[in-house]
């Protein structure tokens, strides 16, 4: 049962009793547990957001209710924990962050499942992925040694790798990372992939040392909104040809490839990168079924065709030398075009940088007549090569 003190706080906060507080009152409000971040605590019933001072629900620093609970548990703010649960926060998110027996007992008293730490972690991870709760997930996992150590090392990496269709670590070339860094980059990449603006802005503010990595990830995943924002609004700059190398290693990445091209990357060099990408077939054939292999390889062929549509010339000596050195389905495709039917596509010749216009242009390109015959040809060639 909640104390009269907690219920009183609930009524006062919901009625915005501290919206016009005086600076001299700040110390008293902090001592009474009515302070959040940089001002008196506020709560929006409609949005389920916890705010501080003049903060709005939409602000980057505002907290979803479950995140506020996790923060309160980490800071041992007992009354706030009770208050947030009263508003509807999921107390099981709190127990996984409790560092002391006293705090765990409080969470159990408030309704947490005592077995959650043993039986609920996998389901929690899946829930956070499905609901795209990026910031909540980072609040729970980041620097939470108890939770990170509860995962078997192999299973932990396999779980994250599987949840991201096996491309989660490609950008970092499967370098050795601490579990903390792996968790952070997984969820950061997740936010960029789904273009979750608030999590991206919050994480970019909190982890500025990852700015270059963020731009590379946006390129790799073809998030032109984030590329545009990072490049032009935050002035995060990399050499366009270096950026193109990241765009090329992800299948079906027309948006990423085009944007690097529009920024000045050499498109012939991009085609050469694709043809020299030895890891393509290794990744395709490692632990994948034939159906998945076909889909991924078709995605790389799509990148090759798209580069040619942008003006890359597959018949110049540099590319022909690469073709002679390699033996893959991509080469079979190019060898089959000796009549030089492949040529630049008129729709793609204007270099534009507005993300909305870029998406419209790519959609127009995909809806043109000469795209689909090529796709059918690519499938037949791959199927013949895999027999």
Swiss-Prot record:
Signal sequence bounds: none
The processes (GO biological process) annotated in the record are: taxis
Record's function text: Plays a role in virus cell tropism, and may be required for efficient virus replication in macrophages.
Similarity comment: family membership: Belongs to the asfivirus MGF 360 family.
Q: What is this protein called?
A: Protein MGF 360-4L
From which source organism is this entry? African swine fever virus (isolate Pig/Kenya/KEN-50/1950)
